Amino acid sequence: MLTKPGKKLDSSESTHHTTSSNYPPLDIVHQTPQPRKEMQQKPLFDPKKMDNLIKPEPAGFTNHHRPNPSPKIPSSPGSNMTESQSNLNTKPNNNNSNNNSNMSSRSNSIESTSSNPSKPHTGGDIRWDAVNTLTSKGVQLGISDFRLLKRLGYGDIGSVYLVELRGTITYFAMKVMDKASLASRNKLLRAQTEREILSQLDHPFLPTLYSHFETDKFYCLVMEFCGGGNLYSLRQKQPNKCFTEDAARFFASEVLLALEYLHMLGIVYRDLKPENVLVRDDGHIMLSDFDLSLRCSVSPTLVKSSSVHAAGGGSGSSRPVGLIDEDAAVQGCIQPSTFFPRILQSSKKNRKAKSDFGLFVNGSMPELMAEPTNVKSMSFVGTHEYLAPEIIRGEGHGSAVDWWTFGIFIYELLYGATPFKGQGNRATLHNVIGQALRFPEVPHVSSAARDLIKGLLVKEPQKRIAYKRGATEIKQHPFFEGVNWALIRSATPPHVPEPVDFSCYASKDKESMAAVDGGGKKNNNGAGGGCSTGGGDNKPNGDCNDPDYIDFEYF
C-alpha cells in the first residue's frame, strides 16, 4: 500500500503526527497508508514580522450549544485561556449560566458517561440498543466493559481501537487519549473540544458518540466503527488512483451536507481531507477527527423571506421584496436546503416556484444565514496541502477555510493529487500563496467540475464561492445538477465495502488482555498522541497470533 507524506507542525514540538481518527479497513494491519499530517505552528508568511509566533488556541471556547468545559479535565500546564480567547472575534456566550445547571446530568467520573439523547438519525441503531441494555441495569460503562481487538489507527492526540462491548455482538471504535501526554503537550482542551462536539452532533454523515469515560490515565471516546476505511485508502485502489466524476460528486455531496450542518452549529471543521472521510459499511461517508475544529457562536439571520411573508412588504421599496440589506447581514449563508433542495434554486420570472411539499406554491422558501464567517481565529492548524491562504498569511480566518479545503478535496478526488503540492512543505505553502491554479490534461474532467474548483480555490476568502451564501450556493452549482439532496441517503454509493468478518474475534474472554506493566517501548515519532505502545517488533509478552490478544500495554 502506498503511503502519502504529510506533516502536522506544532510550535511546541518538532515531532510529526498523523491524523487521530483514521480507521483503515480491517484487512490492513501493518500497511495502512500514512495520512498527511496536520500542522499547528506560527505562520511562515507574517506580513509584519517573519519570526512572529502566533500561539495556537484550542478550538473550544465560545459556544451556545453545549455546557462549559468539564471541571474534570484540568487546564494543561502553560495554557492561557484568556490569551487564546482574545484571538477569536466572536460574540460572548450568554448561555453559560443556563448550561451549568445541566452539568449534573453529565458525568465525567472515572467510570463513564453514556446516554442516549433524542437523536432522530440514530433511531433503530443496534449500538444504542446494546448500550442502553447495559445502562438501563444501572451499569456505568467503563474500559472493563469493552474487549479491545485491534488498533485501527493513531494520530496526534490518541489511538483508535476496534472494540467489542462485552456480552454483546456489537462493535465500536474507541479513541484512547493519554492524559499525561495531552497535559505535557498542552492539548487537553483539544481532547475536550472533540468530546463536546461529538456529543452535540446528530447527522447521518457525522459520528455518533455512544459513550465517553475516563480512567486514571486515559480519556476514552466510544464511537461508530466504519469498516470501509477512508477515502484516501479507497482512492489508492482506483484506476489511476483517482475517482470517476460520478463517484467524486457522490462523496463531495455528502461531505457538503456534513459541512453545512457543522456551520449551522457554529463549528468550523478545519481538517477536511480524504484521510478524515471514513466509509461506512453501507458505502456512505462519515467525517471524523474534530480535535482541530473551531467552535463559535452563530445566529441565524433571515436573508430572504418567502413570498408569503413578503406579500405585506411596501410596494414603494426599490429593494427586491423579501431581501434585507446584504451589508447588514452576516457574511455567509446556510439554508435549510438539505431538506428542500429544489425550492431554493433561483427561478426564472415566468417559472412557477412549486414546493415538493406543497408549501409556498407561488413563492420560495426563506433563506437563513448561519455561516460563522465573522469569527477570526489566528490558529495555524491544518494540513500543508489543504491550508487556506488566509491561514498561512496569518490574517485570521473563519468558516471560509472549509470551502477552500472542500475545493482541494474535490480536486484530489478527481485528479489523484492536490494542486499546490511542492517539493517540501515550505514550497507547498509558497505555492498556495503565489501559484496559480492549474488543471492537468489527464484525466479528463468536465468544465463544470473545473469551474466549481476555481470558485472554491479563490485566494481571497471574500471572493470565494459560498462566502456569502454558504453551502446553498455550492449546491446550486452545475457540478451538482441532478443531485437529490433530500434523498441522498437513499442513493446507491459508488463503492460498498466487503462486510467485515468479526468471527476471528470470537470472544474467549481471556484475562490475558489485562494490563501489561512492562515490555512496551516509547514511540518516538509522536504516534498516538505520545502514547506508548507495544507495536511493531517490540511486542510485550503474549501470543500475538491469538485474536483475543492486543498489543497495547495499558489494558
From Swiss-Prot:
CDD domains: STKc_phototropin_like. Residues 481-555 form the AGC-kinase C-terminal domain. The active site is at 271 (proton acceptor). Residues 1-126, 514-547 are annotated as: Disordered. It catalyses: L-seryl-[protein] + ATP = O-phospho-L-seryl-[protein] + ADP + H(+); L-threonyl-[protein] + ATP = O-phospho-L-threonyl-[protein] + ADP + H(+). Belongs to the protein kinase superfamily. AGC Ser/Thr protein kinase family. Functions redudantly with AGC1-5 as signaling component in the pollen tube. Required for polarized growth of pollen tubes. Its EC number is 2.7.11.1. GO terms for biological process: pollen tube growth; unidimensional cell growth. Disruption phenotype: No visible phenotype under normal growth conditions, but pollen of the double mutants agc1.5 and agc1.7 is impaired in polarized growth of pollen tube. It is found in: Cytoplasm. Interacts with PDPK1/PDK1. Residues 84-118 have a biased composition (Low complexity). ATP binds at residues 152-160, 175. Residues 146-480 form the Protein kinase domain. Residues 526-537 have a biased composition (Gly residues). Autophosphorylated and phosphorylated by PDPK1/PDK1. This is Serine/threonine-protein kinase AGC1-7. Specifically expressed in pollen grains. Activated by PDPK1/PDK1. GO terms for cellular component: cytoplasm. Residues 7-16, 35-54 have a biased composition (Basic and acidic residues). It comes from Arabidopsis thaliana (Mouse-ear cress). Keywords: ATP-binding, Cytoplasm, Growth regulation, Kinase, Nucleotide-binding, Serine/threonine-protein kinase, Transferase. It comes from the Eukaryota.
